[in-house]
Amino acid sequence: MNRCLVVIPTFNEADNVPQLLPIILNLGDHFNVLVVDDGSPDGTAKLVKEMQKTEPRIHLIERAGKMGLGTAYVAGFKFALANGFEFIFEMDADFSHDPQELPRLLDKAQTYDLVIGSRYISGVNVVNWPLRRLMLSYGANVYTRIITGMPVRDATGGFKCFRRKVLESIDLDAIHSNGYAFQIEMNFKSWRNGFKLHEIPIVFTDRRNGVSKMSKQIVYEAVWMVWRLKIK
């Protein structure tokens, strides 16, 4: 089995990381984890370093401050490409994404180039979100699909698997978006470059521990990103 890297951006995830990483690694020896930590004051990076002492498949990038989701994933993608990983995953640290679903993403990635764990491909599969946030997310995805023409029902989700060749085709240094906009941009560029995208249904459960990182700025950025992609 070709090596897999699960990239997990973190900011104050000390409650979740010690539980999450062992679950991922127990899925098989081909799974590695890269934590990209943005200077978490709660000691997230310190916990990861302790785990690294006994597990060589855990990797860590420490950054000086809160630099954003998009740049964290770009750093992770560059690490994956530089270290020979074939399948590169995005995943939240807070158990919103079920780590047991990673093998399903990997299985579909044998056939497709980008596999998206989709909240909306088979109805609406979201747990613990207030109605306003759910409508905002669902509406943003309908809006994205209409404006860009991209045939993806969950363009803003962050649980996915890229084949190496997809990331190699994208100028990662030109990616400057964050949050929803980052997910939309990566999906769009993968699709525009001719790669095969596929969605599988997942259940998204709002974070187990900690505080949500959602903000109005993330939403506004996504609204403008859709038009930027449309006119390029």
What residues fall within each predicted segment?
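Cell-envelope/extracellular polymer assembly enzymes that use nucleotide-activated donors
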Residues: 3-5, 32, 185
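Short beta-strand/loop segment that forms part of the nucleotide-sugar
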Residues: 8, 30-40, 61-62, 91
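Short, well-formed alpha-helical segments that are part of the catalytic scaffolds
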Residues: 13-26
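Short glycine/serine/threonine-enriched helix-capping/active-site loop
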Residues: 90, 116-118, 200-202
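Acceptor/aglycone-binding surface of glycosyltransferases and processive sugar-polymer synthases
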Residues: 63-82, 87, 99-180, 207-227
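Catalytic donor-sugar/metal-binding loop of nucleotide-sugar-dependent glycosyltransferases
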Residues: 151, 174-178, 187-203
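Donor nucleotide-sugar binding loop of glycosyltransferases
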Residues: 13-16, 40, 98
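A conserved acidic beta->alpha catalytic loop
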Residues: 37-46, 95
